[in-house]
A protein has these predicted regions:
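Short, acidic, small-residue-rich periplasmic hinge/interaction motif at the N-terminus
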Residues: 1-26, 34
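Outer-membrane beta-barrel pore domains and translocons
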Residues: 4, 51, 112, 130, ...
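Non-catalytic regulatory/gating segments with a bias toward low-complexity or hydrophobic composition
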Residues: 17, 25, 37-38, 107-109, ...
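Extracytoplasmic beta-strand/coil segments of soluble accessory domains associated
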Residues: 35-84, 105
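Membrane-embedded beta-strand positions in outer-membrane beta-barrel channels/transporters
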Residues: 63-65, 106, 126, 140-144, ...
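Short acidic/polar hinge/loop motifs at secondary-structure boundaries
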Residues: 84-111
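Transmembrane beta-strand segments of Gram-negative outer membrane beta-barrel proteins
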Residues: 105-106, 125, 131-147, 167-172
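Transmembrane beta-barrel wall of Gram-negative outer-membrane proteins
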Residues: 147-176, 181-210
Length: 210
């Protein structure tokens, strides 16, 4: 999907694509997607601000790069959620802290230039986060909580609902740490919500906020 903008067998694509599925995501118990992607995707590197978190400024903030293209703040590496570009206002670069594991069904990473399809922000490649969906009727809830050294707390939850033609996904996270030295405190709130309605077998409408 990321390489052609329509559904295509990955074996028929002329570019290099890595896919990280839900099973791989769940095995890591990481609140952020980026450490997992760094391990699973060749050529993708991320740097954090400290013990956790990435920030959005230059200097102390972290960044993402793919095949050497990116930096701090991240430029030349496009991040999509369900195919929609993610920019931080006038800064024009993605917000690394917003990409949480609970919202992702799978992640597709196109490694290499993709500016013909996606514009100049995709010089290094494209990361497309495909969000989770509730396939069967009913309600599903998930929650993960972790606590460790330096008063570090990591929490995530998700709620997925499907009733008839209506479906919804809501995820949230709260992470904090005191850090291993003074002035290293970090606190982060995150959330994602998506509402959808099936008009027919082939037509669906949805709205989301991150």
């Amino acid at each position: 999907v990321t390489g052609t903008r329509n559904e295509t067998d990955i074996r028929h694509l002329p570019m290099t694509i890595s896919i990280v599925n839900r099973q791989q995501i769940e095995k890591r118990y990481e609140p952020s997607l980026l450490p997992l992607l760094t391990e699973q995707v060749p050529g993708l590197f991320t740097t954090s601000r400290g013990i956790m978190g990435y920030g959005v400024s230059t200097g102390a903030a972290g960044g993402m790069s793919l095949r050497g293209i990116g930096g701090s703040p991240t430029a030349g590496l496009l991040v999509l959620i369900d195919g929609h570009p993610q920019y931080m206002g006038l800064m024009g670069h993605p917000i690394a802290d917003a990409y949480q594991s609970m919202l992702a069904e799978r992640v597709e990473v196109l490694r290499g230039p993709a500016s013909v399809l996606y514009g100049s922000n995709a010089m290094g490649g494209v990361i497309n986060i495909v969000t989770r969906k509730q396939q069967e009727e009913g309600v599903k809830n998930n929650m993960q909580v972790g606590y460790g050294s330096y008063n570090t707390l990591q929490t995530e939850f998700s709620n997925r609902v499907k009733k008839g033609c209506f479906s919804s996904v809501v995820t949230g996270s709260y992470n904090r740490t005191d850090g291993h030295r003074s002035d290293m405190e970090f606190e982060q709130y995150g959330g994602y919500a998506k509402l959808g309605y099936d008009l027919s077998t082939f037509w669906k409408v949805w709205e989301d906020i991150n």
